[in-house]
Amino acid sequence: MYDWLNALPKAELHLHLEGSLEPELLFALAERNKIELPWADVETLRAAYAFNNLQEFLDLYYQGANVLRSEQDFYDLTWAYLQRCKAQNVVHVEPFFDPQTHTDRGIPFEVVLRGIRQALLDGEKQLGISHGLILSFLRHLPEEEAFKTLEQAMPFRDAFIGVGLDSSEKGFPPRLFERVFAKARSEGLHAVAHAGEEGPPEYIWEALDLLKVERIDHGVRAIEDERLMQRIIDEQIPLTVCPLSNIKLCVFEHMGQHNILDMLERGVKVTVNSDDPAYFGGYVGENFAALHEHLGMSEEQARRLAQNSLDARLA
């Protein structure tokens, strides 16, 4: 990574902890937990990281998450991510975790949360990286399941700062989760949601008006709706954009088509994030580098993007 990019203090606001599970750690955890994997070795697994759409990725993502069983596993996953953050001068993180991915496999909620939380606290003490954890609901599951997850989480209310919405976007509009988001907000939690990645601009409107989110995760399709763009600019609603993810999942055919810098120059508060870096070929630093190499991002633009990420923090 370029030294001048590395030198910029940055926050990461769109990162799924389960998506930072590198193949090497995945194999190590499988061995620790005596789980047989369908891949012969790390190279075979990496070769499987070729996706035509979001769903193909998610199928592999959930299969990979199956190796996470104990508090120590979740600690190791989170700690490995934080070490990469330290190396790239990421000074604040607001990662997502997907409790339902694990509780549906019989892993107790508190096992997941304790491992992640301890690593985040150690990251603050030992690495100087501050944090705010976000509990994310899976949108392909019914809202009643999200309510159950929120209920399970409330005894640990001080461990996380907000709720999010992720997983398969097409066919699962934000309006399906209006009640559970209202409940979460009534408990004093922040709200964010994935919208406008594969889904249409209407999903962004719903996230803003029905879920009353403070940030939009992805949001790149907002550019298709001029009225929506104007609102996002006027209200300075942050978009947590994930360039390498967008290419890997065919949201854009290649980086040269990406609209993040167009949005930046129009006054949108866009930020650079890695989404699921183990699967998409890079962490925050690699995403910044890709914008420089393929879109000609200037040092001044990089500074604005980095500052946007710090300004858009919820914690």
From Swiss-Prot:
Important for catalytic activity, annotated site positions: 218
Catalysed reactions, semicolon-separated: adenine + H2O + H(+) = hypoxanthine + NH4(+)
A single MF term (Gene Ontology): adenine deaminase activity
Keyword Plastid belongs to the record: no
Note describing how the cofactor binds: Binds 1 zinc ion per subunit.
Cofactor(s) needed for function: Zn(2+)
Positions bound to Zn(2+): 14, 16, 194, 275
Pfam families the record matches: A_deaminase
One annotated GO biological process: adenine catabolic process
Assigned EC number: 3.5.4.2
Matching SUPFAM superfamilies: Metallo-dependent hydrolases
Active site (catalytic residues): 197 (proton donor)
Disulfide bonds: none
UniProt keyword annotations, A-Z: Hydrolase, Metal-binding, Nucleotide metabolism, Zinc
CC terms in the record's Gene Ontology section: cytosol
InterPro entries to which the protein is assigned, alphabetical: A_deaminase_dom, ADE, Ado/ade_deaminase, Metal_Hydrolase
Keyword Metal-binding part of the UniProt annotation: yes
Broad EC category: hydrolase
TM ranges: none
Binding residues annotated for substrate, in chain numbering: 276
Function: Catalyzes the hydrolytic deamination of adenine to hypoxanthine. Plays an important role in the purine salvage pathway and in nitrogen catabolism.
Family the UniProt entry places it in: Belongs to the metallo-dependent hydrolases superfamily. Adenosine and AMP deaminases family. Adenine deaminase type 2 subfamily.
HAMAP family (alphabetical): Adenine_deaminase (MF_01962)
Name of the protein this chain belongs to: Adenine deaminase
Source species: Ectopseudomonas mendocina (strain ymp)
